[in-house]
Regions:
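Glycine-rich flexible loops
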Residues: 1-242
Length: 242
């Protein structure tokens, strides 16, 4: 069995969870998982029904775009996923969906301010807008890359959908559910009163610093995993020469 199998299986597991919760529909959206210690990731194929997806359907690509495994065409957003992994060592799972409430804000071109401490703790100081660009283009990839450096884990893609990041599959799914909950609450507040108050600044900063601490620990773990893998490969090469 290929050592990429666990990552491919995890992509399918995440897709099924999101499908069951109504965050994914038919072939919309995409999901990817970083392969530990490598510049490689597993990503959903393009235009393939999630209800029929199996591990063998998942594409395995290098960050440079080279195909490693999989016969199907990779998601048109694959390069966007690769860019996130290259820029954020703490991110191990990426989810892009067109889920209804958060996507409604994408159509309104409205970011979500810091409404709840839990939101800031896991998603960041705010859910920022990523300027519109056509799906699957280098323009969208560049727009996303410009936004993710601040440590936030959720973004609204103008006139498109949402992008959520996580250090694990469980955290990414949690972040997606939290984003949809916050988006619904925000929409209701705007509908009823036309406004929504932010959580107090000191609380926001405490919550955000906890998030940043988690991200630094994840980045450190990723660096250690890469170093261990490179050392193992070096030992293997040395053994071959002996």
């Amino acid at each position: 069995m290929s050592h990429y199998a666990p990552s491919r299986e995890l992509v399918v597991e995440v897709c099924r969870t999101l499908l069951d919760r109504g965050y994914l529909k038919a072939t919309e959206g995409n999901v990817s998982v970083r392969v530990p210690g490598e510049d490689v990731y597993a990503v959903t194929p393009s235009s393939y029904d999630y209800s029929r997806m199996e591990a063998g359907d998942i594409c395995v690509l290098g960050f440079d775009g080279r195909r490693i495994l999989g016969q199907k065409k990779a998601s048109i957003e694959a390069s966007m996923h690769a860019a996130v992994y290259e820029l954020r060592a703490d991110v191990n799972v990426i989810i892009h969906t067109h889920q209804p409430y958060a996507s409604a804000l994408a159509l309104m071109e409205r970011p979500i301010p810091a409404l709840f401490d839990e939101q800031v703790r896991y998603l960041g100081r705010s859910v920022e807008l990523v300027p519109y660009a056509p799906s699957g283009t280098g323009f969208l990839k560049k727009n996303v890359a410009k936004r993710i450096g601040g440590g936030a884990n959720a973004f609204i893609l103008e006139n498109h959908g949402v992008l959520v990041l996580g250090g694990s599959a469980e955290q990414a799914v949690h972040n997606m559910a939290l984003l949809e909950k916050v988006a619904l609450d925000y929409l209701l507040a705007l509908l009823i009163d036309g406004r929504a108050e932010k959580v107090p600044l000191p609380i926001r900063e405490i919550a955000f610093q906890k998030l940043r601490k988690d991200e630094k620990e994840l980045a450190h773990q990723a660096t250690a995993a890469r170093a261990a893998r490179e050392a193992a490969e070096a030992r293997a090469r040395e053994a071959e020469r002996v």
